[in-house]
Amino acid sequence: MAKAKYERTKPHVNIGTIGHVDHGKTTLTAAITKTLYDRYQLGEAVDFANIDKAPEERERGITISTAHVEYETPNRHYAHVDCPGHADYVKNMITGAAQMDGAILVCSATDGPMPQTREHILLSRQVGVPYIVVFLNKCDMVDDEELLELVEMEVRDLLTEYDFPGDDTPIVRGSALMALEDPKSEWGDKIVELFEQIDEYIPAPERDTDKPFLMPVEDVFSITGRGTVATGRVERGVLKVQDEVELVGLTEAPRKVVVTGVEMFRKLLDQAQAGDNIGALLRGVQRNEIERGQVLAKTGSVKAHTKFTAEVYVLKKEEGGRHTPFFDGYRPQFYFRTTDVTGACKLPEGIEMVMPGDNVTMEVDLINSIVVEEGLRFSIREGGRTVASGVVATIIE
């Protein structure tokens, strides 16, 4: 078979393995790279040992071990993350260190769903992983068809419990270890089948430039005779000169403004797009009517809120976090995009306190309304140092 030439035109998808300890996440990751290389001569085979000794990274001051591998199918290019320990998964998913467009839930056919299977599904729901495909592993060790069906049913029920479409979720039965030992075998076929399902079931993500425009305001200054300039990095979408946008957050109601100029590196542009650091010249806005912490956004695309639920990871003392627990009613600063806002934490019923190193679902009530959306990452700070990292799960008001 002729070697497929690598083209950057393939859609790129971020994916990861989740599931209980020792159910075979890392073995599957290795088996995927080996099988896809063996079958299509695409990507490169990565050894189990290289994935298992994942390097430590620091994301928002938190130490996380994550292995990154890349591979491709005939249709797509994938970036895949695998974490060695359960704590790494929790941190990774909450900080968004490795964004996932979809996940492969690995569940051992010999054990069925276990506590971390449940916890990873819950985390996926909380942090906004949109799609899950299931790989039922170690099927070479189970002869009983009824047992396999029972485990499948349990996994589907668990997915449904956390608002994933359990009945429609693709489940592929296989053996990562057997596929790793012989990618040409029928077990290798199962890896190919898994990716046929993933290619079809997990859509390629919408590109940042296709989303509605949003730019957090970082700084504001006035240019005599020209007006007020707001600077910041365009988070998503495209901004064209003469667009009418809204200034949202920290005020009672959003305010419509017209962008009369877009400047980048002291050059004037017709338009700016996601990733650009720009200055936007705003017509008819006084210097004192706009401040850091507000956002410029496509009219009607976002709202400012004060109350939401969040999934939060509290830094350990060794990570520079608190040395003591905090309690219900704790009032730290919440750092969103470019600004700190004070807020109160309401802990779930039955949870008295939260220890450094814990993860917890909490309700947050901010003193000022700012633009927050489901899936938005934030830090919790005390006196300028980060003590926790979180992600918005649901908006309350």
Swiss-Prot record:
Gene3D superfamilies, per the entry: P-loop containing nucleotide triphosphate hydrolases, Translation factors
Region (G5): 175-177
InterPro entries linked to this entry: EF-Tu_GTP-bd, EF-Tu_GTPase, EFTu-like_2, EFTU_2, G_TR_CS, P-loop_NTPase, Small_GTP-bd, T_Tr_GTP-bd_dom
TM ranges: none
Enzyme Commission number(s) of this protein: 3.6.5.3
Annotated residues for binding of Mg(2+): T26
Region (G3): 82-85
Domain tr-type G positions: 10-206
Region (G4) residue spans: 137-140
HAMAP family linked: EF_Tu_B
Family: Belongs to the TRAFAC class translation factor GTPase superfamily. Classic translation factor GTPase family. EF-Tu/EF-1A subfamily.
Function: GTP hydrolase that promotes the GTP-dependent binding of aminoacyl-tRNA to the A-site of ribosomes during protein biosynthesis.
Known partners and oligomeric status: Monomer.
Listed name of the protein: Elongation factor Tu
Organism in which the protein naturally occurs: Clostridioides difficile (strain 630)
Gene field: tuf1
